[in-house]
Amino acid sequence: MSFAFDLISDLHVETWDQFDWHHQATSPVCIVAGDIARDRDIVTRTLKHLGQCYQAVFYIDGNDEHYSHLEDLGSSYSDLVRRIKRIPNVVYLQDNVVIVNGVAILGTNGWFGFDFDLGIDASQVDQWCQENYYMSATATKNIARLSNTDASYMIDSVQKLQRHTDVRKIVMVTHTVPDPALIAHDIDLDGSMKFNVMGNRLMMQAMAADTENKIHTWCFGHYHGSVDQTRSGIRFVNNCRGRQHTKYSRHVYHPQRIVIDF
């Protein structure tokens, strides 16, 4: 038996001249791993468009969707839920596990706890974010809190899915990078403050909860370089488009088709 899906993320639609996904689909369903745009109306329009291109679109938000709402992330999430539930063929993965043909799709943003590299002081990274990204102390506190709750949600959900006999495999979806080792090769990031806002190291605790070895693939975004690695039998893969006119961006961009055989 097999299950196939297209993976896309970090479209940053507002930085490109246009986004037209007609005739681009290579699978019946699509996973979008966050950072569609900062403008909520663009996010909504893009998801509507993708919903016309696929039988189903499974979406998780990125940090960019909350760019103007970091002071009140609770309200920000409520607004996303309200908008997305009206869109045909689009499913918001936050707090919503989807099971398709024996495959569970489990997703959350993930955020970052400012401690991705334990050798870099998290409090200094927190302050650096406030100064460089013009975040308030309230915003960074909210982000750090959600990084913990998102990790707990994924760990607890993986544990529960071990007992579901109808779930053969699990696809994990986070916007941020789940393991520092996946991007440790990047000399532009290594040892930098920015490295510590790339991912959530707590996510790897979900591996210990996977006692039946159901986790098959872990999809993520946020890091605009290319990653496709297998670690401990699990495929870690991203497919980010990136912002136009930046070092890591793709003018020619296609979905990454992923097939799970079991």
Q: What is each stretch, according to the model?
A:
Residues 1-6, 97-107, 168-169, 230-235:
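Beta-strand-turn-beta hairpins that frame and shape the catalytic cleft
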Residues 1-60, 64-76:
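N-terminal active-site segment of His-dependent metallophosphoesterases
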Residues 2, 99, 190, 195-215, ...:
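Binuclear metal-dependent phosphoesterase catalytic core
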Residues 12-17, 37-42, 64-71, 97-99, ...:
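Active-site environment of divalent metal-dependent phosphoester hydrolases
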Residues 23-26, 49-54, 164, 207-213, ...:
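Short, conserved loop/helix-junction motifs that constitute active-site signature segments
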Residues 56-129:
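A basic- and aromatic-enriched beta-loop-alpha substructure that forms the phosphate/nucleotide-
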Residues 106-171, 176-194:
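Active-site-proximal loop/helix segment associated with metal-binding centers of metalloenzymes
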